[in-house]
Amino acid sequence: MTISRRAFLQTGLAVGAGAKLAFAAQTRPLLGLIAPPADYPIPPEGLALYDSTIRFTVVGLGLQTMTPAGYDSVIDKIVPAALELKKRGATAIDLLGTSLTFYRGAAFNDKLLGDIRKATGLKATSMSTAVVDGLRAVGAKRVAAATAYNEEVNRRLNTFLGESGFEVVAMKGLGLEAIGDPGKVTQETLQQFSADVFKQASKADALLVSCGGLRTLEIVAPLEKETRVPVVSSLPHALWAGMRLLGLRVKAPGYGRLLANG
């Protein structure tokens, strides 16, 4: 079989282009995610927002219940998980799990991040830090919070937000505890629930939807339209904070004010 020079050159160009694309993909920043569940995939929200810009790698902690006892059972796994992410080549670390990082207060969240940075030498943020950064970025002071949590975890969130400089004017949770249950909440149910919580608030200037397991990306913009205030939610804005940690600002219009601004 004889291959023409033109075909040979075309094949070589195609192989070369493919190799360049593969090399480019491998040189994109790698954001390491520490996730509460044991088997946590790369979040679809991350792929939808930033797949062309960065890569993701995930280590799960094996959290079973969203309760203080559940969080206590995995808290010592966080630094080893961060070290595993460093071994994989992570450029920075994003500690997911809003309640996992706020349940002992703002100072403990800061300590967790300090421990990760000291152990790995990498930049790090957490989901709780991300929602605080998001609320501050939109100028929030009086916050309504719709959550996945039970009353005890809500009480701790209230304390954390107060320590972070916000006044909580309304808060209500879905009462969920099993780690997989937030993902079963439909977006229609969650949007209505969140809007109802906001309506209970007295002059809230922002709405927080708290829990990384809730699927919130597609409801942020509709909620902002309905409530006429900025909406911050756990997973999308943790990914937003992770991008900023990497020194990147990628605009993602259609998903609310913060993501649209990058």
Predicted regions and their residues:
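Glycine/small-residue-rich loop that forms an oxyanion/phosphate-binding "nest" at active or ligand-binding sites
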Residues: 101-120
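N-terminal secretory signal peptides
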Residues: 1-3, 7
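Short, well-structured alpha-helical segments in soluble
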Residues: 75-88, 192-203
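N-terminal export signals
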Residues: 7-24
